[in-house]
Amino acid sequence: MKTAYIALLSTTLSLAIFLADRTAFAQNEAKDAGSKVFLNEDFSKSEASQAPAGWVVTAPNPALAPVFQVVNFPGSRSGKALLAAGNGRPECFGFIEHPVQLSAKDYCFRVRFKVEGIDDVNRNLTHGIFGTFNDGIFRYRREEGGWIVGENRFRGKEGAGKVRLTYRFAATGKVWWDQVYLGECPPIPERPVKIAVSSGAHKMDFWPGWLDVAGRKKVTIALMTEGFNGKGVDQPEPIDGPAGRLMAEKAKQWKIYVAGAFYEQRWDLIFNSCPLYSPAGALLGIYEKVELFDPEIDQGCSPGHEVKVFQTEFGNVGIMTCFDSWHPETARLLGYKGAELILFPNAGYYLGLMPARAADSGVWIAAASANSPSGIWDSSGAQAGNVKADSSRYCDTSILDYEKDDTNSMITATVDLSRQYSPHNWGGPMASAPGGRRVRQTVMRHLEDDIAREAKRWWDEPAK
């Protein structure tokens, strides 16, 4: 019954977010009107069969140049659209740019278009802002009539820049843009999240007090370690047993999110489970560890079947547990599914993996460890309390504050989820955007297909 309830809750939340996003696009269009950075956003002032006025076409290799021109297009906003089409070669690559002058204000960048013969919008198209800072559009949704809408909001910097639309790697594809909009928008709100992680192994009687400290520190979310209740596979508890009840009660008492991992008995199966409780004390969902360490399997624990993302009031939360971290696919899949913060309860782990897992997938990571150093990392791989340690990291940090409370075995940090930096943020979103942004990949075909095939190959073959 509880599993069915969780599935229903997840479906309801997903539907609500879909409808809210859809409404937001329409509201944003009206709200941003009158603050345009450049005009002719719908190409109504351009002549058919020509490049649109004010835009410059670039093809680094003329032999691979796509076609860019304005065409008459019934059903578009103005009756016209900007067409980009392949030249018959799979290596086809080129872009069209419009100069803009920006300031230290917040901006909305929006496009609307239709495609034909385009397998993957992220692989075949990019929509970027290049200048003293770089950003772009990384999320799209389907709309009625076959239209696709993409939008992003970002904080600008003073200086000249360019809006760039790129067409790449689609031999016979076509795209018709009927809107390319850039304009000022209301200030982007910060999204501060205060995280508490525990450190060290403790007995069950330690945790009520620890959660009280987290509550008094007014954290948003508190994470305990893997096996925090001190029981092994041979002593599993139901989800509403002592460990689960403690988490629910303290979450409700302090109005915070609470998570931690323990061995859960469910029917005739045992899982290494990490439940997540809401500030109301409600069970939002349970993640069952998918990559079990050998002793767990030998002792009767079963692996989970799914990498999950949970919606909370502050953002999307994913979970990976201990040995999951040794496999980059776990964090990457969470990033692909929209996770912003990954909770990482563990008994022990390799510290050096965390900056890579965070930066590769563009996520924040909170690690609570029983036997290794606990920590909190932002999406650029910067560690709270140690943000300048890596000289090869070239960006700001989204970490707002940090405290290491050894007396209470607790680390807290506040991060701003509205600032998703990558390690080389100056390198441009199409070259160094967080890995969770699929558009970062510049391959002609997805390597995931090869990875999936090779991962399933158990027999030796000659190297190719």
For every predicted segment, state its role.
Residues 133-160:
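Extracellular carbohydrate recognition and processing domains
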Residues 47-81:
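Extracellular glycan-recognition surfaces and repeat-rich motifs
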Residues 165-172:
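Short beta-strand-plus-loop segments that form exposed binding edges in beta-rich domains
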Residues 7-21:
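Bacterial N-terminal signal peptides
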Residues 41-47, 82, 86-123, 148-156, ...:
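Extra-cytoplasmic beta-strand recognition segments
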Residues 175-187:
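Exposed low-complexity, polar/acidic, P/S/T/G-rich flexible segments that act as propeptides
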Residues 216, 221, 236-259, 325-419, ...:
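CN hydrolase (nitrilase-like) catalytic-core segments centered on the catalytic cysteine
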Residues 266-337, 352-356, 360, 389-399, ...:
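Active-site catalytic loop in hydrolytic enzyme cores
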